[in-house]
Amino acid sequence: MEERYNLAIDRMKAIIEEKTVAEPYREYFQHVARFILKLDELKQNVESGKQKEMSEEELQEEMKDLYADELEANYEKSYANPAYAVLVLGGELGSFLSAVYTEIRGGISYVQEQRMEYVVIGAELLIEIYNKFEEEKQPQPESLKEIFYWYASDYCDVFAADRIKDQIDPERGCFIVNMIMNEDLSDLRYLYRMGEYVGVNERETAAYLNSLSQEKIDKMADTFSEGYRIGFVNTGKDLSKKSVVNIYYAMGFERIVKKAIENFAKMGLKPSIFRTSHSVITRGRNSQIGFFNISGNKQYVYDHRDDIGLVMDKQYVERKLEVMRTTYEQNKEIAAGYAGPAVIDIFGEKTFVPQAKPEAVKLSEKQEELLVAMNGRSGRLTNEYLPGDERSFTIISWPVPEIGEQYHEIFDETIKINTLDYKLYQKVQQTMIDALDKGEYVKVTGSGENQTDLKVMLHPLADPAKETIFENCVADVNIPVGEVFTSPVLEGTEGTLFVSKVFLHGLPYYNLKISFKEGKITEYTCTNFDSEEENKKYIFDNILHNHQTLPIGEFAIGTNTTAYAVAKKYDIADKYTILIAEKTGPHFAVGDTCYSWAEDVKVYNPDGKEIIARDNSISILRKEDPSKAYFQCHTDITIPYDELGSIVVVAKDGTETEIIRDGRFLLPGTEILNEPLN
């Protein structure tokens, strides 16, 4: 590998001097070659130990130089921007070469982890494309795409295989873990050696956590890790059989993660932490998974979300799935110890309104179908080696400095929200469940300009003394406390869901309107763009995840009025992660149920009743054809209390019982939830 690396670096040095490629392409190749030479300089600083001796100011300069083409200040005239690349390099070639540069830019992270094979592979990709331009003044786009195709196909058994191993094997996914456990976290220079861009959010988060007492850090970490443990207990799964917890989190929260790792060790769990993917081979479309930075240029990420379109065909799908199966099979003993993810989410970032650029790579309709099929098969394959009925998860969220001047106060309020008395909520929510269990269906309506008008069918109970429809959800897998939820009966569930403003997976939606018939989406729109076609495409890509329709997988009533009151006090309702937002009103999830891949595991509420509403008429198809049962997505859409008219449960005999009216809880025993609202 060292010889290949040296040859590649020598070639980069030659490219920046040569004139064998015609303009405007020559300048592009020389620019990318210079970037790779910067990676070589970074490599020398890392390997020699020089980077550890650099001042924070020097580290910031090094970082800004490496990330210059991604930063908003420079992005408009960057080859990483497909719009600029097309302007300078022309049509298809511009989009293609922008995607190639983006693929190579992952090298910053690879050098920090000293995964030099990845850097070599990227440099050799550039050389092969460069050679094509030396042979022909302007090569045909198809011949260039073929080079990229075989790059992705050939090295799938490197990138995709390593991705799986980094997830399940703590000896592999250990770079971030070692940084957390071995570095002096009070010296913020460590951040610059983690391989992601360090902005205000990352630095100020770490600095603020350093100012907190160990007792406060322990409280946050204990809530997080204990939620994970209780998730196994409440679902009757044996945590003692497991050995690996996969931690996802945003850079800056290392002090909390360090304590959480110590807590997990007491449960017999070793941590694995992989970083968010920087390669088209392993990158998802809609969210960052793993260890990620907060302050990066989101438009850059959005512009390249469909770069997989350069290679997506049936043969590539089969190749990737083959690599996945081979990797799991070769590591099945290690995979058996995988317990599931523990996730720290964040909220408070500035609103990102994506610009849909025609110059960016787009998936064709056929490719969208292939992607949906691949994700479905990938999910089933993963479940084969990491069975859903044996693993669990937990997820918690905290704010980041970008939320505003009252960041410290909001952070303290969030700690309170995340540590509310679950026993109080458990009792109140049981009162609500007792009323809901008597219903045949529930009516949910909006107030004022909110057009929501939904009828939600409920599962019938064969034995009400031993069975229940709704889960009494307190603070285990979903922190904070505060919801009761069910999997609706699809048949007969119909109407309109409307929200004036909501953020889903970091993207805003204005006047989101979704219509349902027989529990499945039939129509959808929003007012984000002037063009109705763009609005529909935006929802199709980011909520339906390229499925022609999705069912309602969950109906829930959020009860965390404290979180709602905090949102009103600080005007941050639009900043909440869905994890908290879903607790601040009724919500509906489109996609899979909350019990996907574990429907046959019996689960019980604290009162001992079995929750029987774990399936619907689509998920039950898993017994005949799993490909028809799952969608690999679950998106919660919340109606805030101030847009809510009423929630009424209707019994078979027509008797109506109001749960909420005009944003206030009405059932005797639930009035305490109104106190924060008052």
Spans of model-derived segments:
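Glycine-anchored, exposed beta-strand/edge motif detector
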Residues: 584, 590, 599-604, 615-623
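Short acidic, glycine-rich loop/turn motifs
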Residues: 444-450, 501-504, 649-653
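Dual-mode signal for accessory low-complexity, basic/Gly-rich regions
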Residues: 523-595, 599
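Active-site bordering "gate/hinge" segments
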Residues: 1-491, 660-678
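Extended hydrophobic packing segments that form well-structured cores
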Residues: 607-678
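Short solvent-exposed loop/turn micro-motifs enriched in small/polar/acidic residues
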Residues: 437, 505-508, 548, 581
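Active-site and channel-lining beta-strand-loop segments
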Residues: 509-526
